[in-house]
């Protein structure tokens, strides 16, 4: 039986809410048959932060796994877990935010979330389906949607609120009128896309920086193998007797950033937590610092001549 790891946490802004610095991601299409077993095994290993979204097929089975974990005594109460979900683009309108969160809670059988994020800084008409049609793309009412997110927190539907895939410029729009500051900005980050400027901005504003795709999201529509095939990381992994994945995840963690890992393989789930009792040296960090940069999650789907973002440069405000 693998040992249970105690994962360090970070306090989110002035909320007093603590979030485990390594989370368990649940995005997969279609969801594997052993997903619930994977979640239960993750809890046994020590994972307490589970990341989902209304557009993922994992909300309901995650909720079922939490119920089972309580029944089995793997956790004593739901309060031991930190659950994040996200507002999808078809619900990113001021009057649809609260109903969308309530639907996510119903899907999971939960009374509250620990964190609720705006998934992406763009909207789709409520009737939109996948694949996305360019004519369905709409600009986001940042101020109105954020006010509705604030109401979610005031109502106790979520303990904290935040954003995902937001640039510094788009965060500035939120901050200009926000009564409750975003607790989190969850974005792509790994040794091949280090996000130094955005990290500095978030740190200055008291917004916790959280990383998805720490290994490059190989096998997804937006993923690439540039992390897993990186010679610098391979050399460091060999020298330290660690896997390349451990080097990449440790690097993110060592930046003071939380990281959402994703594997339903029991061995790799355990391996991804074996990052706390060793460090990357200043020399190793310097080598990683020099790796050529590449954004994997580019969002071309939401670029349109008639939409809010006519180019990728506009979408990412030059952060590309």
From Swiss-Prot:
The active site is at 56 (proton donor). It is an enzyme of class 1 (oxidoreductase). Its EC number is 1.1.1.-. NADP(+) binds at residues 51, 186, 264-272. Keywords: NADP, Oxidoreductase. Pathway: Secondary metabolite biosynthesis; terpenoid biosynthesis. GO terms for molecular function: oxidoreductase activity, acting on the CH-OH group of donors, NAD or NADP as acceptor. Gene3D superfamilies: NADP-dependent oxidoreductase domain. It catalyses: 7-acetyl-epi-neemfruitin B + AH2 + H2O = (1S,3bR,4R,5aR,9aR,9bR,11aS)-1-[(4R)-5-[(2S)-3,3-dimethyloxiran-2-yl]-1,4-dihydroxybutan-2-yl]-3b,6,6,9a,11a-pentamethyl-7-oxo-1H,2H,3bH,4H,5H,5aH,6H,7H,9aH,9bH,10H,11H,11aH-cyclopenta[a]phenanthren-4-yl acetate + acetate + A + H(+). The keyword Iron does not apply. Pfam families: Aldo_ket_red. Mainly expressed in petioles and, to a lower extent, in roots. Aldo-keto reductase involved in the biosynthesis of limonoids triterpene natural products such as azadirachtin, an antifeedant widely used as bioinsecticide, and possessing many medicinal applications including anti-tumoral, anti-malarial, anti-rheumatic, antibacterial, anti-inflammatory, anti-pyretic and diuretic effects. Can use 7-acetyl-epi-neemfruitin B as substrate. Belongs to the aldo/keto reductase family. This is 7-acetyl-epi-neemfruitin B aldo-keto reductase. The lineage of its organism: Eukaryota, Viridiplantae, Streptophyta, Embryophyta, Tracheophyta. The gene is AKR.
């Amino acid at each position: 039986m693998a040992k249970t790891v105690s994962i360090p946490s970070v306090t989110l802004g002035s909320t007093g809410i603590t979030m485990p610095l390594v989370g368990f991601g649940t995005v997969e299409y279609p969801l594997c048959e052993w997903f619930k077993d994977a979640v239960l095994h993750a809890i046994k290993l020590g994972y307490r932060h589970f990341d989902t979204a209304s557009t993922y097929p994992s909300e309901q089975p995650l909720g079922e796994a939490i119920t089972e974990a309580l029944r089995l005594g793997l956790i004593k109460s739901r309060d031991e877990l930190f659950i994040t979900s996200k507002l999808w683009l078809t619900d990113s309108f001021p009057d649809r935010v609260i109903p969308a969160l309530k639907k996510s809670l119903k899907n999971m059988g939960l009374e509250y979330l620990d964190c609720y994020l705006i998934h992406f800084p763009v909207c789709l008409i409520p009737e939109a389906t996948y694949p996305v049609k360019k004519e369905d793309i709409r600009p986001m009412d940042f101020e109105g949607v954020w006010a509705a997110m604030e109401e979610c927190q005031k109502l106790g539907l979520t303990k904290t609120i935040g954003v995902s895939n937001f640039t510094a410029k788009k965060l500035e729009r939120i901050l200009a009128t926000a009564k409750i500051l975003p607790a989190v900005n969850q974005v792509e980050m790994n040794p091949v896309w280090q996000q130094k400027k955005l990290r500095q901005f978030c740190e200055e504003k008291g917004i916790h920086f959280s990383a998805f795709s720490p290994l490059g999201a190989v096998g997804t529509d937006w993923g690439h193998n540039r992390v897993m095939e990186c010679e610098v990381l391979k050399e460091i992994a060999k020298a330290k007797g660690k896997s390349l994945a451990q080097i990449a995840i440790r690097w993110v963690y060592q930046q003071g950033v939380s990281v959402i890992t994703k594997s339903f393989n029991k061995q790799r789930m355990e391996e991804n937590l074996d990052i706390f009792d060793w460090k990357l040296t200043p020399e190793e960090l310097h080598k990683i610092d020099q790796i050529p940069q590449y954004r994997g999650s580019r969002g071309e789907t939401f670029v349109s001549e008639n939409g809010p973002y006519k180019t990728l440069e506009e979408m990412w405000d030059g952060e590309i």
